[in-house]
């Protein structure tokens, strides 16, 4: 019992710190958008994309690359820690409780992708972007949920977090399987050896953090050169960090996650937003609106239909039950908030169209538009959820 209480206490502290980073991220996204449409736009672009005078890693020769391939690996490391914690000691550890959020997350990824592919059906060059509207931004969504105020069932926030974590796991799998090219076997072999060494360290019962952190950096370096996106290394390394509590109720994973929550939420993700969210609203993106429209509709409509539809079907079939105290309107609002793609969607957009900056800019427009409308709609629906609903 003491072990379970220890997990719950640290889990509670982590949960309490999730709203503020979302609000900071919203502010950074707004600032990036403002600068991109101001006389400072050219200087801002040069700041992130001009070659650095010196870099310790030749492949990362701009600030933008260091943020997207370097700092974002730390972001994915934290995502990996969250996933492992939830699977072993959280909501996803109970088969009955994980049914609904897992089903909702899978449907919430599949339906947006199908809507995107339907809208871009006549343009095969755009099909690589199918995963862009499938993502959910945990920090952004929790930040908006915090603006609703009190009066919502506690189970709703937990449901949103669990769906978003499963969604993150799906995004990691998608990145590893569909956005990998030019594999280099020697670097892959080196990555496999480092990962095996980390697993061995775990099996030996080592609880000091230094071996895991050193191994994570080495794994990131080899994966960066292997052809697989470097951020995947963050998730793989996180999976080797031990979760189990010792007699003093100390868990290396929880200790590490707790230490990284603030840097991740207040430094890494906001920097990513500043470097990637800016888009010139008056720019000429070409004749076809299919790319931004497909992304926006995938986020706004796909998430609603996928998540809310899967919940209703699961209830009707007796497969799962809605969160305690949640009404249909509550769940509709949560489905809308899951349409806030932002961080992960922007990240996938860069992977989908690495050689075509114009398509990335178009994708940004769809991501920002779809995420903004989803956020506002979700806020309105949840703020009015005090009225009698089914």
From Swiss-Prot:
> Any keyword Ribosomal protein?
no
Cite the Pfam families for this sequence: Na_H_antiport_1
UniProt entry keywords in alphabetical sequence: Antiport, Cell inner membrane, Cell membrane, Ion transport, Membrane, Sodium, Sodium transport, Transmembrane, Transmembrane helix, Transport
The terms describing its cellular component in GO are:
plasma membrane
- Residue ranges annotated as coiled coil are none
Q: What superkingdom heads the lineage?
A: Bacteria
For the keyword Cell membrane, the answer is yes
Entry's Gene Ontology BP terms: regulation of pH
Where, subcellularly, is it found?
A: Cell inner membrane
This protein's membrane topology, according to the annotation, is: Multi-pass membrane protein
MF annotations from Gene Ontology:
sodium:proton antiporter activity
Which residues are listed as membrane-spanning?
Answer: 23-43, 63-83, 100-120, 129-149, 158-178, 181-201, 208-228, 265-285, 293-313, 331-351, 362-382
Q: Which cysteines are joined by disulfide bonds?
A: none
Catalysed reactions, as listed in the record:
Na(+)(in) + 2 H(+)(out) = Na(+)(out) + 2 H(+)(in)
Q: What is its main location?
A: membrane
Q: What does this protein do?
A: Na(+)/H(+) antiporter that extrudes sodium in exchange for external protons.
Family per similarity comment:
Belongs to the NhaA Na(+)/H(+) (TC 2.A.33) antiporter family.
Query: Which PANTHER family does its entry note?
Result: NA(+)_H(+) ANTIPORTER NHAA, SODIUM ION/PROTON ANTIPORTER NHAA-RELATED
Q: What is this protein called?
A: Na(+)/H(+) antiporter NhaA 2
Species of the source = Novosphingobium aromaticivorans (strain ATCC 700278 / DSM 12444 / CCUG 56034 / CIP 105152 / NBRC 16084 / F199)
């Amino acid at each position: 019992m003491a072990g379970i209480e220890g997990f719950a206490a640290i889990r509670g502290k982590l949960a309490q710190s999730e709203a503020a980073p979302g609000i900071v991220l919203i502010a950074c996204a707004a600032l990036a958008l403002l600068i991109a449409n101001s006389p400072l736009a050219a200087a801002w672009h040069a700041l992130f994309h001009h070659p650095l005078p010196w870099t310790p890693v030749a492949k990362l020769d701009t600030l933008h690359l260091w943020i997207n391939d370097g700092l974002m690996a730390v972001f994915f490391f934290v995502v990996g820690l969250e996933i492992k914690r939830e699977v072993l000691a959280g909501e996803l550890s109970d088969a009955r409780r994980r049914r609904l959020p897992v089903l909702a997350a899978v449907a919430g990824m599949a339906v947006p992708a199908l809507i995107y592919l339907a809208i871009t059906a006549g343009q095969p060059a755009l099909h690589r972007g199918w995963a862009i509207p499938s993502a959910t931004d945990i920090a952004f969504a929790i930040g908006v949920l915090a603006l609703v105020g009190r009066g919502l069932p506690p189970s709703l926030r937990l449901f949103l977090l669990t769906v978003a974590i499963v969604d993150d796991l799906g995004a990691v799998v998608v990145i590893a399987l569909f956005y990998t090219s030019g594999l280099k076997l020697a670097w892959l072999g080196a990555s496999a050896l480092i990962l095996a060494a980390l697993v061995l360290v775990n099996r030996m019962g080592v609880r000091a953090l230094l071996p895991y952190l050193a191994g994570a950096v080495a794994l990131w370096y080899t994966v960066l050169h292997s052809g697989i996106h470097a951020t995947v290394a963050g998730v793989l390394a996180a999976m080797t960090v031990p979760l189990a509590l010792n007699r003093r109720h100390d868990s290396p994973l929880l200790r590490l996650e707790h230490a990284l929550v603030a840097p991740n939420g207040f430094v890494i993700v906001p920097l990513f937003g500043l470097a990637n969210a800016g888009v010139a609203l008056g720019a000429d993106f070409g004749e076809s609106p299919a790319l931004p429209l497909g992304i926006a509709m995938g986020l706004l409509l796909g998430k609603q239909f996928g998540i809310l539809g899967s919940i209703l079907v699961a209830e009707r079939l007796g497969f799962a039950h809605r969160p305690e105290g949640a009404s249909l309107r509550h769940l509709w609002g949560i489905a809308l908030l899951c349409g806030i793609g932002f961080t992960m969607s922007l990240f996938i957009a860069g992977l989908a169209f690495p050689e075509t900056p114009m398509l990335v800019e178009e994708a940004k427009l769809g991501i920002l538009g779809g995420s903004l409308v989803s956020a506002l709609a979700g806020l309105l629906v949840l703020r009015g959820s005090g009225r009698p609903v089914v």
